[in-house]
Amino acid sequence: MSRSDPDPGKNSEPSKSKMSLELRPTAPSDQGRLNEAFQDEDLEEQNAPGNSTVRSRVVQSGEQGRAKQDDRQITIEQEPLGPKEGTEEESEDERQKGFLERKYDTVCEFCRKHRVILQHTIWAVLLTGFLALVIAACALNFHRALPLFVITLVTIFFVVWDRLMAKYEQRIDDVLSPGKRLLERHWFWLKWVVWCSLILAVILWLALDTARLGQQQLISFGGLVMYIVLLFLFSKHPTRVYWRPVFWGIGLQFLLGLLILRTRPGFVAFDWMGKQVQTFLGYTDAGAQFVFGEKYTDHFFAFKILPIVVFFSTVMSMLYYLGLMQWIIRKVGWLMLVTMGSSPIESVVAAGNIFVGQTESPLLVQPYLPHVTKSELHTIMTAGFATIAGSVLGAYISFGVSSTHLLTASVMSAPAALAVAKLFWPETEKPKITLKNAMKMENGDSRNLLEAATQGASSSIPLVANIAANLIAFLALLSFVNSALSWFGSMFDYPQLSFELICSYIFMPFSFMMGVDWQDRFMVAKLIGYKTFFNEFVAYEHLSKFINLRKAAGPKFVNGVQQYMSIRSETIATYALCGFANFGSLGIVIGGLTSIAPSRKRDIASGAMRALIAGTIACFMTACIAGMLSDTPVAINCHHVLESSKVLSNTTEVASCCQGLFNSTVARGPNDVLPGGNFSLYTLKSCCNLLKPPTLNCGWIPNIP
């Protein structure tokens, strides 16, 4: 054994003690504290490059001198490495604190100990103050405060519901489990009774409603049945169709439409909501006017429409930060889940598409996209094609399209998308994602509300640029295609050949089966062609022209060309166009989903075209439901009313038809009068004799022998 080695009999235990103390830093001791005048110097030496050799020098000294290292020596060497903590030091720091600092620490400690009680107290005070304001507003003018009162009640209901379900959900389930088991035992017979009763009720309602309003409702019902049959015939797996989501989806469509379009409370509520949305979006003008000047409306689309997209995107981002949008999406998704039996992923995405776009809604379930089934992936794409984003909803409203019908179409299209998707591509696999996982949604990466607003405005820049660029490109392309078709048609003495004319013949059967008036079927078919081959912006822009011409009460026919549609046809067209189902969106969906889930690229590409067709038919089915429920009177056949009898009677129908005839008549002077709508001068003279219109000089009409 070498001389430098420690004696195993004596120094084995001390050596172990020394090694353990060297590897574990000890707390500083007051006995080993250095002079305070040299504290900074010691710290600088500790941070110097040579301080790593301190431990090795101690070990070497112990080995050469065979001296025991006591705790005090180790503590002195290790003091700069350890934190300076100690009760006496803390008490010394306390004595050095000022009076205000000690009081502040006391208050902070009190708040930490009673944090829950303080939070509840603050919320109670705020809630009490808000309820006092609501009561005061109702006492002053209840009719004026009715919306605030309803919103408050709905909010309180859902907050209390969430708290009760979070705390007593299992108990409620245990109480209801006997009734649930009873229903499950007899459900095979009960479901047939329920479905047959509902079908009979719908048939009876249609019969009575048709007798009151006319036969157009039956055509819409026939169109709905036709689309269901077509989807079943061309289904991916016709024998594997699960009919519960199909019937429930159509049923929810019908119930929502019935509530909104036929009941006064529902219509008033959605009409009020639509007007509030219009008013809210009107605040965009303040920013647009400041940026673009007072004459910003001279460039209506660029400076009036597109800023609405920026504003709405900002608001949506703020609502996401607050968690309100996620809460609404979870509630709507849960409703579709328990009624339709769709998977949690499908329900969440379909509910999300009511508020966000087809590329944003898959982000709600981004972690689970690589694991969804092919049918679920098809449903996700179909839901995107069948609905529109909330950010562009305001732009369509600014065109002059009815905000009530646009909001209704957005809500009705969500269950329609699930029903169509499950019929066109039935589920043949077992979904892997559970309800609990799918309902978890992030609040975004914004750190505060102001940052969320900034991110929302910035994220709208690509969307605005995309809308403007696509409109420029598509309208230019449409003009070129029409010129080329006109040139080609002129070779056969038919220069009227155009893209609109071709689309009107392709989509005319579909538009007619939705229930539009017979004379408007080609006009609606043209709009569907615009929407399918270009985008819905182009289609709604043309629809707004028809609406404005009708409101201006101008001539309905000019040189034999119809200028606008009936109100019923406008309503059905609004529902049929309310979706992103077009070939431009096809590339957007494939690119967006592929970037989110690269492993599913092949499945996305193979199912995208079927999803586009399914989304289009979902919009058509929503239009059929609107046609069944629309109580707008069918357009009067004025040719039959005015020309079937020689003597006109002063009835409402005759007066309406004569007024339309007056508006469409062109009178240049005596004996130079051209009746509109292909009516005869005799009919025009008869209407003049009956009503004597102030806008037309009936003396200019030549005498008819």
From Swiss-Prot:
Q: Which domain of life is it from?
A: Eukaryota
Compositional bias, Polar residues, is annotated for 48-63
Q: Which residues lie within the membrane without crossing it?
A: 347-365, 525-544
Q: Which GO terms describe its biological process?
A: nucleoside transmembrane transport; purine nucleoside transmembrane transport; pyrimidine nucleoside transport; pyrimidine-containing compound transmembrane transport; retina homeostasis; uridine transmembrane transport
Record's subcellular location: Cell membrane
Question: What sections of the protein cross the membrane?
Answer: 120-140, 146-166, 191-211, 215-236, 245-264, 302-322, 379-401, 404-425, 461-486, 584-594, 608-630
Listed Basic and acidic residues bias regions: 1-21, 65-74
Extracellular-side positions: 141-145, 212-214, 265-301, 402-403, 487-524, 545-583, 631-705
Read off the NCBIfam families from this record.
nupC
Tell me the function of this protein: Sodium-dependent, pyrimidine- and purine-selective. Involved in the homeostasis of endogenous nucleosides. Exhibits the transport characteristics of the nucleoside transport system cib or N3 subtype (N3/cib) (with marked transport of both thymidine and inosine). Employs a 2:1 sodium/nucleoside ratio. Also able to transport gemcitabine, 3'-azido-3'-deoxythymidine (AZT), ribavirin and 3-deazauridine.
- Protein name (database record): Solute carrier family 28 member 3
| Gene name per UniProt | Slc28a3
